[in-house]
């Protein structure tokens, strides 16, 4: 079991380490490069990854309904448990709760799912990523920007390239229209490039980790996988998941906070320095939390 877990996580954290090392060597110049990389991922490669994963012939959306319901339960339970913890610790819930709910199921979760459960796991992992992003851009924004913006503003955030690529992919998954295979393969090649590039970009972001606001960062790094795994146990008790689905759900639940939490905190000026600490310390602590989730998931 230990060897299998190491075989899964070492390549992922290896690419993150390469990104971190590259950022250290490049210095301040790396920020503009990372910005261009993120724009490329968000506007082209990420949408193509979502489209090709969902439109693939072996992806059946109806079969993934229990897994998606499980992911929604994990997100909901995480928020419900994190809220009183934030109050007890003296944190602003708008700062602390969203990073506990919305995890790094994109640039860390996708490659981990493929390495742990094989290429067939990419479609379900993308579906959970899409669900999490949709809730993040709607419910998550409402929590962070409580009282600042109307509902229609947060709904407009859903009209981004990632969501558009997802919508087209879902339409293909339902209707199954004819599509030239060579063209699909070309789009898939581009989409697959998104995964290592997201890991590399995450490594670049790690250079911003500092000791500032360490208390909320450390507490968040502990609470995030704990409440997530609690949600996974609740979902597992309520839903009829197969072995692979159960494994993917526990992996999803153990992931650290998404980097998107920091971006939204900056946009809405909701203590972004504290959210940055939660996000970055949490991703560093994933070296411990992800193997725990994998062990629980692979045990099935």
Where are the language model's segments positioned?
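Alpha-helical transmembrane segments of multi-pass small-molecule/ion transporters
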Residues: 1-300
């Amino acid at each position: 079991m230990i060897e299998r877990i190491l075989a899964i996580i070492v390549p992922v954290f290896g690419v993150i380490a390469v990104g971190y090392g590259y950022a250290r060597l490049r210095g301040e110049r790396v920020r503009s490069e990372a910005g261009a990389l993120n724009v490329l991922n968000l506007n082209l490669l990420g949408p193509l990854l979502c489209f090709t994963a969902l439109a693939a012939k072996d992806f059946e959306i109806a079969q993934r309904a229990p897994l998606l319901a499980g992911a929604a339960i994990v997100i909901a339970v995480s928020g419900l448990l994190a809220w009183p913890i934030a109050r007890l610790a003296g944190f602003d819930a708008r700062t602390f709760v969203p990073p506990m709910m919305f995890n790094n199921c994109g640039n860390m979760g996708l490659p981990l799912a493929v390495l742990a459960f094989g290429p067939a796991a990419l479609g379900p992992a993308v579906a959970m990523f899409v669900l999490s992003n949709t809730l993040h851009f709607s419910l998550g924004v409402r929590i962070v920007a409580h009282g600042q913006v109307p509902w229609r503003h947060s709904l407009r955030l859903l009209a981004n390239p990632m969501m558009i690529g997802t919508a087209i992919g879902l339409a293909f998954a339902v209707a199954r229209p004819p599509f030239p295979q060579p063209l699909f393969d070309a789009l898939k090649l581009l989409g697959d490039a998104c995964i290592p590039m997201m890991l590399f970009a995450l490594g670049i972001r790690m250079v911003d980790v500092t000791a500032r606001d360490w208390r909320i960062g450390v507490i968040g790094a502990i609470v995030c996988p704990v409440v997530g795994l609690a949600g996974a146990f609740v979902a597992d008790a309520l839903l009829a998941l197969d072995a692979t689905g159960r494994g993917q759900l526990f992996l999803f639940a153990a992931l650290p906070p998404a980097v998107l939490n920091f971006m939204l905190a900056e946009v809405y000026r909701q203590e972004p320095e504290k959210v940055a600490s939660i996000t970055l310390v949490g991703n560093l602590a994933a070296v411990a939390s992800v193997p725990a989730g994998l062990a629980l998931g692979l045990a099935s």
